[in-house]
């Protein structure tokens, strides 16, 4: 998963994407059920299925019958109305472009989940192509026939994505995969004859590279039947060779060249030292391979590899750039000069460069500060580059760059919703010291307040990102802006050691048993808040999803005197039980990051830093949210910490989504989650 994807996932887990405006005085507080104003009449709630949870007393939440809760009071109708009113902000995800650059395939949400849409001209009408209840994540045009699409779709949040074929002429959709394995990383050959993707179909544990002809996609051939995780990256022109990645962890991956017909493979990167591999692509003539890796330096850089002589030292095209290269696009038009485009992550913001493939000469493209992604050169147009762009104050939309003139053309305009744009804020980048000489970078968002001359101490919400190999960046987050503008709180998004974007030494600084030392970054964050004249250390809440959920629980357990409230979304409560019960296909990948719990010395450290082991120390009010179908952090991680705190007493809210997995994707669940989270923060942080 790319750093940007990891970041976006972390924000999605902790805060669903909703909108806001500043009316602090009108936000009602959560009340006891008997005293609450009547909520709008919900649809009849189904009887919960037998045994959905080990927590007794769970009942469907009004308006979200698949969300079962206990300890959560009735949410005031006015607050639900506020959430619904600001729940319609949208963003556009660039998925693919036709070979001539005249049609764009994008993902956006008009109903409950993200679906496929087609745009056929700049600022043209969006035509919806898929209408399922489950979200669509990846999609590709068939190059020689853009009426045919292949896409990956989830089911119930379990992340066992299935591959489908859609013919736009007949609207016929056909399931290509087996309906039960996990499938990902779809690539299509330049000519459109072949497809490749990663699949766990063989044994549920190992991830193989699968090949199919696009005309007969159900006839499939496994190109790898090896232990571990393998995925396809790019076909060579002609489709006879395929770049594949072997991944042991986020910091340990190798690049291979696979002969499609014979199955023979050749290593393109040396065995040592271990290094990350972000992506790799063939040149338009297939004679060179461009890869983004930190194998030859401290940061991820663009290198040119000769596949005929992989043992030779590669040409390091961006060795002078002191920041991570985060994405790569290579033009496919063989009748035009070779063209590359990259982004560089400088202090959390993306810079776009065009790269001369031979010399590595960089040509900056001036764009507003923000985040970029989804880069695509149309196969037959090396003079056009499509990309998605967002800033902290504007939703993600799709743009096109004319490479010759450097002019950009907007293709989509996503709705902001009924938000006063003047209330949206940009963050300030701050740094503060932690143990061992580490400097922790963080983004601070503060509400716009009238200049009265008084210093007002603001309550603070700390948002921990997931991963842990993620990075907090200034993405467009309507809910983060809601917290700032509506609740009047400051939001701090730290990048503790172990985050991407600051070099591989910083990334590895929390690996294995070093995680115990890295938890001191939590204390450093709280100390920094206490040292600020305009932040209130007596009113601090923390939240986060996945690994950010672990940090949320860890803050509550190990810094109990410095915290008022915590909102844990699909977080790890015990590393030992997490590693034993996470899906088999990802268990070894996570052991490479957290340590092997089967080693007694490692197990002792993991137990010591697990919040469940110190649950009796938690004093803060706690709200735990979990998806029943989570393949990454199982439901038991949430329920064992809830049970421990219920026995101890105190404020504990719990919500379980029956039709979600690792985070909440359905709009009705996200709306209910946000309404409850706002009510929780009002009761526990702002009173």
Give names to the regions the model predicted.
Residues 461-463, 491:
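Hydrophobic beta-strand anchors of alpha/beta hydrolase catalytic cores
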Residues 8-16:
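Bacterial N-terminal signal peptides
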Residues 464-466, 626:
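The conserved beta1-alpha1 loop
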Residues 1-8:
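Bacterial N-terminal signal peptides that target proteins for export
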Residues 53-82:
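Blade/loop signatures of beta-propeller domains
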Residues 86-93, 103, 111-117, 131-457, ...:
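Peripheral, non-catalytic segments that deliver or gate enzyme domains
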Residues 19-25:
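Boundary at the C-terminal end of the N-terminal hydrophobic targeting segment
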Residues 493-687:
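Active-site-proximal cap/loop segments of hydrolase catalytic domains
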């Amino acid at each position: 998963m790319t750093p940007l994807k990891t970041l976006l996932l972390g924000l999605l887990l902790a805060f669903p994407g909703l909108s806001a405006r500043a009316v602090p005085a009108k936000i009602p507080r959560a009340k006891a059920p008997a005293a609450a104003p009547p909520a709008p009449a919900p649809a009849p709630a189904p009887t919960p299925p037998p045994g959905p949870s080990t927590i007794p007393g769970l009942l469907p939440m009004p308006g979200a019958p698949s969300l079962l809760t206990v300890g959560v009071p009735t949410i005031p109708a006015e607050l639900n109305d506020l959430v619904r009113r600001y729940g319609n902000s949208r963003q556009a995800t660039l998925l693919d472009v036709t070979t001539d650059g005249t049609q764009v395939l994008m993902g956006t949400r008009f109903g409950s989940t993200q679906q496929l849409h087609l745009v056929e001209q700049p600022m043209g009408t969006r035509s919806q192509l898929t209408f399922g209840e489950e979200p669509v994540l990846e999609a590709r045009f068939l190059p020689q026939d853009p009426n045919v699409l292949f896409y990956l779709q989830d089911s119930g949040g379990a992340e066992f994505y299935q591959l489908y074929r859609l013919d736009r002429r007949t609207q016929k959709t056909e399931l290509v995969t087996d309906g039960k394995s996990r499938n990902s990383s779809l690539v299509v050959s330049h000519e459109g004859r072949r497809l490749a993707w990663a699949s766990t179909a063989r044994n549920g544990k190992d991830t193989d590279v699968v090949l199919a002809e696009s005309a007969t996609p159900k006839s499939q051939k496994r190109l790898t039947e090896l232990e571990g995780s393998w995925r396809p990256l790019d076909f060579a022109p002609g489709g006879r060779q395929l770049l594949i990645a072997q991944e042991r962890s986020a910091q340990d991956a190798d690049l291979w060249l696979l002969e499609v017909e014979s199955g023979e493979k050749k290593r393109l990167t040396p065995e040592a030292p271990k290094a990350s591999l972000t992506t790799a692509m063939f040149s338009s003539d297939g004679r060179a391979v461009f890869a983004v890796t930190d194998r030859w330096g401290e940061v991820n850089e663009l290198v040119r590899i000769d596949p005929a002589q992989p043992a030779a030292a590669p040409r390091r095209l961006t060795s002078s750039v002191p920041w991570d290269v985060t994405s790569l696009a290579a033009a496919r038009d063989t009748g035009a000069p070779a063209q590359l485009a990259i982004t560089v992550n400088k202090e959390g913001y993306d810079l776009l460069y065009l790269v001369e493939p031979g010399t590595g000469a960089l040509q900056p493209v001036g764009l507003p500060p923000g985040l970029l992604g989804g880069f695509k050169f149309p196969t037959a147009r090396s003079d056009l580059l499509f990309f998605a762009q967002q800033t902290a104050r504007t939703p993600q939309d799709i743009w096109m760059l004319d490479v010759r003139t450097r002019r950009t053309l907007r293709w989509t305009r996503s709705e902001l919703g009924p938000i006063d744009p003047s209330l949206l804020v940009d963050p300030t980048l701050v740094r503060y010291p932690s143990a061992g000489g580490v400097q922790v970078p963080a983004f601070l968002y503060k509400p716009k307040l009238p200049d009265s001359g008084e210093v007002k101490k603001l309550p603070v919400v700390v948002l921990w990102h997931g991963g842990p190999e993620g990075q907090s960046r200034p993405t467009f987050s309507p809910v983060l802006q809601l917290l700032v503008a509506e609740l009047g709180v400051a939001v701090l998004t730290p990048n503790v050691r172990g985050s991407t974007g600051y070099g591989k030494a910083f990334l590895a600084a929390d690996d294995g048993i070093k995680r115990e030392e890295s938890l001191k970054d939590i204390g450093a964050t709280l100390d920094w808040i206490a040292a600020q004249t305009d932040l209130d250390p007596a009113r601090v809440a923390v939240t986060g999803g996945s690994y950010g959920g672990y940090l949320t629980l860890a803050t509550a357990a190990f810094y109990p005197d410095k915290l008022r409230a915590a909102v844990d979304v699909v977080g790890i409560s015990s590393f030992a039980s997490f590693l034993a019960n996470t899906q088999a296909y990802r268990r070894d990948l996570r052991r490479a990051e957290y340590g092997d719990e089967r080693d007694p010395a490692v197990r002792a450290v993991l137990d010591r830093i697990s919040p469940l082991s110190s649950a009796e120390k938690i004093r803060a009010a706690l709200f735990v949210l979990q998806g029943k179908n989570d393949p990454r952090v199982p439901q038991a991680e949430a329920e064992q910490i809830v049970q421990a705190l219920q026995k101890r007493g105190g404020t504990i809210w719990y919500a379980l989504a029956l039709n979600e997995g690792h985070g909440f994707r359905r709009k009705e669940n996200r709306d209910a989650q946000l309404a409850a989270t706002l009510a929780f923060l009002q009761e526990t942080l702002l009173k």
